[in-house]
């Protein structure tokens, strides 16, 4: 299993599936299964009440998308998606957007 080049906080665009075309930052990554959650993308799920306090019903929960179904949004040209490359700048390895050759800011 290859290491993911997309990190938490990166702004991505969904390129496949029922949520195709939606854009948002990554809120969580499950590396072993290669799933990501993107802010603003939810699915409706029926939830049964567990005890007297909680209510059941149809709830919106964060959708888990496979990492291959999202692509990084180009930081320079927001309409395009790009692949991630690496370059050594001032002795540090930094992530680069391959289409625009701009450095990708890492969210912390």
Swiss-Prot record:
Keywords: Ribonucleoprotein, Ribosomal protein, RNA-binding, rRNA-binding. GO terms for cellular component: ribonucleoprotein complex; ribosome. GO terms for biological process: translation. GO terms for molecular function: rRNA binding; structural constituent of ribosome. Part of the 50S ribosomal subunit. The gene is rplX. Gene3D superfamilies: 2.30.30.30. Belongs to the universal ribosomal protein uL24 family. This is Large ribosomal subunit protein uL24. It holds the Pfam family KOW. One of two assembly initiator proteins, it binds directly to the 5'-end of the 23S rRNA, where it nucleates assembly of the 50S subunit. One of the proteins that surrounds the polypeptide exit tunnel on the outside of the subunit. HAMAP family: Ribosomal_uL24_B (MF_01326_B).
């Amino acid at each position: 299993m290859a290491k993911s080049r997309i990190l938490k906080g990166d702004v991505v665009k969904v390129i496949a599936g029922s949520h195709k075309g939606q854009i948002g930052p990554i809120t969580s990554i499950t590396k072993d299964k290669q799933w990501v959650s993107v802010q603003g993308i939810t699915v409706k799920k029926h939830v049964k009440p567990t005890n007297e306090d909680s209510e059941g019903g149809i709830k919106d929960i964060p959708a888990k998308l496979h990492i291959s179904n999202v692509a990084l949004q180009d930081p320079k040209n927001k309409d395009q998606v790009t692949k991630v490359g690496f370059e050594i700048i001032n002795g540090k390895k930094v992530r680069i957007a391959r289409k625009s050759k701009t450095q990708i800011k890492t969210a912390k």
